[in-house]
Amino acid sequence: MIRNLCSLLLLISLLSVQKAQAQDDPQYRLEIGAGIGTMAYEGDFNGSIFKNMQPMAAVVGRYNIDPYKDLRLNIGFGKIKGSSDNVDSYFPDYAEQSYAFNNTLVDASFVFEYNFWPYGTGRDYRGAKPLVPFIFGGLGATYATGSEKNVFTANIPLGIGAKYKVSERLNIGLDWTIHFSLSDELDGVKDPYRVSSSGAFKNTDSYSTLQVSLTYSFSAKCRTCNKED
C-alpha cells in the first residue's frame, strides 16, 4: 500500500515537472542584432534585380507584440550600381557614350511582420514553432550618394522571410525585400528617356535586399502581468 502510494506520488511529481517544462517558453519583448546580404538596383540602367548584386550590412531591432506579430527596424548600408550597357533601351543623352554609376545607399525601414504560426522554442503549450515563415510591409527612407548627386527619398518596403529560434534567446532570419522608392534619381539621372511621366510610382527606381540576420532576445515579458497564462 505504502509502495503504491509512493509510486503514485512520484508519477504525479514527474507529470507536474513535465507540464511545467512544457509551459516554460519565455517570451521576450525585444531583439537586437545584425545582418549581411546583398543589395540590387532595378531601374533605367539595370533591367533585372538579379544583376549587379552588391554586398550590404544592416543593424536590426525588433519589438515582439505577441508570438504572431512584431515590429522591426532595419537600417541597411550597401551599394547599387548599373550601366546603360546593361539594357537594350535607347537613351538620347548616352547614345554615343555609355553611362554608369556606383552609388552608396543607406536605407532605414520600419515594418510590421506577421508570422504564419506562433513563434517560440516549441516547448510552449500553445504550440509555438521554432521555424516560421512571415510576411511584412511598412515605410522607409532612402539616402543615395554618388558622383552625380545625393538623393533623399521615401520608399515602401514589402517582403517575405523565415526565422528560426536557435535557442531561447538566439534567432536566425532570412528575408527578401523589395523597396519601391518615390524617386527616379537613385541612379543619379532623372528620366533618361526624356519622356514626361506622372504618378507616385511612374518611372521610379527600386532596389531589393536579400538578408541573413542574427538577433539576440532580451527583456522577458511578465506573463502573469500580461495575462498570458
State what each model feature region is:
Residues 105, 167-229:
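Predominantly the C-terminal beta-signal and adjacent terminal strand-loop region
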Residues 21-62, 211-221:
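Short glycine/proline- and aromatic-enriched beta-strand/turn motifs that initiate or cap beta-hairpins
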Residues 1-27:
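Bacterial Sec-dependent N-terminal signal peptides
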Residues 45-49, 84-90, 123-127, 147-152, ...:
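Outer-membrane beta-barrel translocator domains and adjoining extracellular loop/strand segments
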Residues 28, 51-55, 104-108, 131, ...:
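Residues that define the transmembrane beta-barrel architecture of outer-membrane proteins
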Residues 67-148, 216:
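Gram-negative (and chloroplast) outer-membrane scaffold detector with strong preference
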Residues 34-38, 59-63, 110-114, 137-141, ...:
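Residues on the lipid-exposed face of transmembrane beta-strands in outer-membrane beta-barrel proteins
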Residues 27, 64-68, 117-119, 165-167, ...:
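Outer-membrane beta-barrel channels and translocator barrels
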